[in-house]
């Protein structure tokens, strides 16, 4: 029997014993060595050759991942590991580290119970380290730490034992500071989740040279850091690997310190699902009941050239089998399961069934998207997966040949299904479509894949930055009148407090929640009690309050009012950009008693006009997206690096020394950061490494607003004259 087939059989057997299952993700800042580490784990499990581990990058299966040398998609693999005489099934997801692909990390965290955070010993904790930790902790996923590239401290930087210990302890302290800050507010975590060398939740080593150590492994092998430094310096890395193999150290840590599904699900389910906690479904999810109703949370959609769409996700309850007819949240009817399987590296292996507590690969769920709840009974869906950052860059995309247009439209729909952080706007009339993503690289990869994988030659436009509009002060009460003059609505707008905006963004307050729970969440974020009781609708980060009392026919008209409200908020009055962070109050209404005179053609424009005029009275402004920028550069080039930020309307917040490099930290508008890569390379003679991270939106300077508004209105084919009442720039 082939080695691979044997592993599949072992996995199938272990799937039925949740105590021996560990669902884990490996996450880190870009280039800190996740995929090389994953190769080592695969080699340790006998799934790839030990000789090629670290070079094969077995989890980077796409051509563009191999070319760019970075992980773009999260990849799944199941493997086995024997720990303390017991065989364990480890379902592992290798995630991207580049900020543009953070959506894949967020979705992966929903499927797992533990996150192995990898940090480069030389660079230390970086911006994306903080982001992946936040993504893990928000989903109730327990972290451990592996400090990689320790060989560089010994051989390259020639650090002595004291210097090295100081550096490693500093990395651990930084990571623990992040963990403490994020878990303080989490009531459902009653244990200390900080990492510790003594406890065995920290490992050290070199993924490239395949050796690793932890406190338990040093006690077991009798090796200490002195031995490691001697072997590393005398270039006896193979002996080091043989005496203390990396895979054993890391997988032992995974088995010992990460929870199994039986321990994890009772804590995680209330965090990610807001249904009735007394129901049978709740009970079978919390107890990982393989005989309960089937509940699958889809975290990823991929396409196989032979099998078609494959939905990957975590089975929280029941047992998935071929032929089952399952509900998909947000769609009518049922989908029939064509096959179930598990992942072995880049390939899917079909199995008879996948029980609760495992990660499965399913075909046949044609209506599912990343984030869908799939179940054998109709149920409250899981909380939507909140992505840390929203799209900030848009490009137009069109087929070079008109004959390819239908295929391109279909492909774009598929792209947004596979990656919910990509937003697609399809205009079937003009043939020009818009694709929005997290950054230039994100869009570049998606458009190249459309050309390469689908064979559709495309033209793309210049990158366009996504803006927002927001009120700056409370407005007066404004009247909106319907075209037939029989219906009147009295509206005011005010800025929504930032804490309430954050609560909505994080999913702590939404219209999907029971009303009482939503009220409490909004009050906790700072909303007044009476206001929270009158919340009628939440759209984006805008809240609509109905302050009216006993108005006849209002209930039956409310749906049209909300439609008009959403139209006004989707296209703000300045430049038809989305409005955010506003509280809209309906104070009073006058409605015609005859329904025929208060139909859509009357109510929607009246509401839209009232909201727009209120926003103008509230001195609405354009907001631009900004990015945090960090540049690591030799001292001689520090001035050039800070000049690159300042020359882009940016601001330098901090400069400090870290090792032999200077670190420059600041913020800059996304619009000005287009083309930054090539400019910083030439300014620093290729000596700089840098990171950017989306940091939300800020009000654009008043002197820049008119020109930017004109530019956007021109691009959208709108008339250039703003409403006369906009006279505050």
UniProtKB/Swiss-Prot annotation:
The modification Diphthamide is found at residue 597. Keywords: Cytoplasm, Elongation factor, GTP-binding, Nucleotide-binding, Protein biosynthesis. PROSITE patterns: G_TR_1 (PS00301), G_TR_2 (PS51722). Residues 19-262 form the tr-type G domain. Its main location: cytoplasm. It is found in: Cytoplasm. SMART domains: EFG_C (SM00838), EFG_IV (SM00889). This is Elongation factor 2.
